[in-house]
Amino acid sequence: MRLESWSPGLTHLRTDGTAHMVDVSEKVESTREATLREQFVQLSEVLLLLTSDGLPKGDALAVARISGILATKKTSELIPLCHPLPVSQATVDFVLGSDRVQTLCKAVKTRGVTGVEMEALTAVSVAALNLYDMFKAIDKHAVLTDIRVLAKSGGKSGDWDLGTSEEKA
């Protein structure tokens, strides 16, 4: 199957449909940054335990934060076609609501030739998975939802912010 007619923007696919790692050796190095969020909907009782350090496995937010930061550094090992990047900064924070925890990867930064969206996506995903692991004995109905890129900057494609984009969903 030839793909050039419908997938000119899919850089990880050759025209015959096989996957390959994109050659970034000729790209110009620049500062790259990405910001993401994820929602974790759960029982309010779990959130009460979370804020009072009452979870059986310990401090869930600390574990999730560190796991998210570590995930940024391991992205190329988990996502085969991602280039390994020197991560300069990774910030993972949480906003507690009445029935949800919002995981925010406020900044993943690098100085390199490719973006850090995949590293930020991996950070919020792994942080959320760690929260789920720590809550699952109490709330089996928790839902991970709405993982999305909020903003990115740097590189040839320039800056993008969901808050100012016409592509809001």
UniProtKB/Swiss-Prot annotation:
Pfam families: MoaC. Pathway: Cofactor biosynthesis; molybdopterin biosynthesis. Substrate binds at L81, C82, H83, M118, E119. Keywords: Lyase, Molybdenum cofactor biosynthesis, Plasmid. InterPro entries: MoaC, MoaC_bact/euk, MoaC_sf, MoCo_biosynth_MoaA/MoaC, Mopterin_CF_biosynth-C_dom. Gene3D superfamilies: Molybdopterin cofactor biosynthesis C (MoaC) domain. Belongs to the MoaC family. PANTHER family: MOLYBDOPTERIN COFACTOR SYNTHESIS PROTEIN A. HAMAP family: MoaC_B (MF_01224_B). This is Cyclic pyranopterin monophosphate synthase. It comes from Paenarthrobacter nicotinovorans.
